[in-house]
Amino acid sequence: MTEITIKDKILRLQPVQHVPEISLYLSDSPHHKINTEDRFECWQQAWVGGQALARYILDNPELVAGKTIVDIASGCGIVAIAAKIAGAARVIAIDDYEPAIQCIGLNAGINNVEIEIVQEDIFNYSSDVGDLFLLGDPFYDEQLFDYVQNKFTPVLVGSPIRLPYYVSYYNSSIQTYTLSVPPGFDETNSFDTHIWWLSE
């Protein structure tokens, strides 16, 4: 099955541009045609922060091998899937939106990995289970940034510079990728996307 519909959104199975080991059901709509200010829309794409973090995990599997990994605000599930492929013993993907939950399940299945999927608002997530917490391109507001920083450890993030209050973290980034995006998918053709420890 190469095409599915979730919540009136048509998703097509396609290899991820910068992580070709993984194929996902994704929207063909350009990013600027998705309401990125509405976090409930963001599950349709593999954003560059998620792609960068997935790439880093697959290239450095020792970070996750044999561990329990928690992917926060999982979206399409790319980071969770990468962690499982890289050898994580257990992967928990958390998102609070039902279409995202459906999408993660379908994407895990097409990549032949088992992921525990939890539908819950991250601000209500009380479990302390997890050897490593992962976030791919999650920070669009300061509230989530502060909450995650204070609640979970260790936390590894993949993200371009989206908001000024965490620019200082990029001074200690452990990897930077310049990731291109398809023409028309954003206002720019590429992003410098950083991997960094929010807490460790």
Regions of interest found by a model, annotated:
Residues 1-200:
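S-adenosylmethionine-dependent methyltransferases
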